[in-house]
Amino acid sequence: MASGFLLCPVLLAVFFMSPVEVGAFPLYSLFTNAVIRAQHLHQLAADIYKDFERTYVPEEQRQSSKSSPSAICYSESIPAPTGKDEAQQRSDVELLRFSLALIQSWISPLQTLSRVFSNSLVFGTSDRIFEKLQDLERGIVTLTREIDEGSPRIAAFLTLTYEKFDTNLRNDDALMKNYGLLACFKKDMHKVETYLKVMKCRRFVESNCTL
């Protein structure tokens, strides 16, 4: 009974929309779902990074790894915006393509993530990330088709990907490699979240629109 009352405002909103607004309503839902998924994925990436850091990485190694050349992420090798101000200067299609590039660069590495941490504190988090990443990928592909006349063109940089996580957690080099990968994953998911929020905010005026 309660669910029926909850649907009424939505149905009334669609009923009183102009034809253009009715066409935009599904697009609003697509953006909303994508933003929610990106926020959740970014939070999961941050949680697993913190858990890994706390469990495996001494304080002195944390500082040295952040200044290491190996800490440079793939997203920094392509012309992707670094923050919301730069993102606002790009078109929606560009931001969607950058988002898709970043997501697809993690598809292969994240297939092994749960095996790497199968006996650790972060297993419960890592086991869900791959599935959620695929969900977000599908959502962004759908958005791109809606906005870019149904035929998204794949840029050359989409073929690049990160290395896979190392399963040998007793090796210092392997630990630091995984630590660097998790840092990049967190950074890249934050960028995807920012891009999607920028697009949604400038397409749909909302009182709670924050970046």
Swiss-Prot record:
Q: Where in the cell is it found?
A: Secreted
Example GO biological process: response to nutrient levels
Q: Any keyword S-adenosyl-L-methionine? A: no
Instruction: Enumerate the UniProt keywords alphabetically.
Output: Disulfide bond, Hormone, Metal-binding, Secreted, Signal, Zinc
Q: Name one Pfam family in it.
A: Hormone_1
Q: Name one GO cellular component term.
A: extracellular space
Protein purpose: Growth hormone plays an important role in growth control and is involved in the regulation of several anabolic processes. Implicated as an osmoregulatory substance important for seawater adaptation.
Q: Which protein family is it in?
A: Belongs to the somatotropin/prolactin family.
Name this polypeptide is given: Somatotropin
Q: Which organism is it from?
A: Lepisosteus osseus (Long-nosed gar)
Q: Which gene encodes it?
A: gh
